[in-house]
Regions:
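Active-site glycine-centered loops adjacent to acidic/histidine catalytic or metal-binding residues
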Residues: 28, 96, 123
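Switch I (effector-binding) loop of TRAFAC-class P-loop GTPase G-domains
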Residues: 1-22, 33-46
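Canonical P-loop GTPase G-domain recognition
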Residues: 99-152
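Flexible beta-alpha connector loops of hexameric P-loop NTPases
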Residues: 30-40, 62-71
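Active-site-proximal beta-strand elements of phosphoester/diester hydrolases
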Residues: 24-30
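Conserved C-terminal guanine-recognition region of P-loop GTPase G domains, centered on the G4
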Residues: 21-22, 45-118
Length: 155
């Protein structure tokens, strides 16, 4: 068996933040793959290569799944990202649906999946961790859009 999300990219754009500065473009790529024919894996990698210029890469993991399923998916995704030479400093792992698990499981998930990137646990149903995720996005946007005082050119 294998997993793949068959939907195409989804793009959302927020023109300005609350301070009226900048904006955020979010590209939601296809989902996880495993045990696929080579040509489909190559197509998936090609899709991911388009994301390499992103300021941030958020890897979402459904924390309500079985740990072994999460481990396999995470490991395969990390192998592909490593093969594509993704800058690890841009990578953040987002554990979703944490309202569906005992929050004490979060540390166990991080350990068992051997997650080496920053982790943010969120729940879209309860709002848990959403402020932290928004802060990460806005801080990264602010840093990228900050003007260099000496040249008045964006960094």
């Amino acid at each position: 068996s294998f997993w793949i999300t068959t939907r195409s990219f989804k793009v959302r754009h927020n023109n300005k933040n609350k301070e009226g500065e900048g904006g955020i473009l979010i590209v939601d790529t296809v989902g996880f793959i495993s045990r696929l024919p080579t040509y489909m894996i190559d197509a998936f990698k090609s899709t991911l290569e388009e994301s390499l210029g992103a300021d941030l890469i958020l890897l979402l993991i459904d924390s309500a799944e079985k740990i072994e399923d999460m481990r396999i998916k995470y490991s395969n995704c990390m192998d592909i990202l490593e093969e594509l030479n993704v800058d690890k400093s841009k990578l953040f792992t987002i554990l979703t649906k944490v309202d569906k698990i005992d929050t004490r499981m979060i540390n166990e998930i991080v350990e068992k999946l051997e997650i080496n990137s920053d982790v943010i646990a969120i729940s879209s149903d309860t709002g848990y961790g959403i402020h932290k995720l928004k802060t990460l996005l806005m801080r990264k946007q602010f840093l990228e859009n900050k003007y260099n005082e000496n040249t008045n050119v964006k960094k």
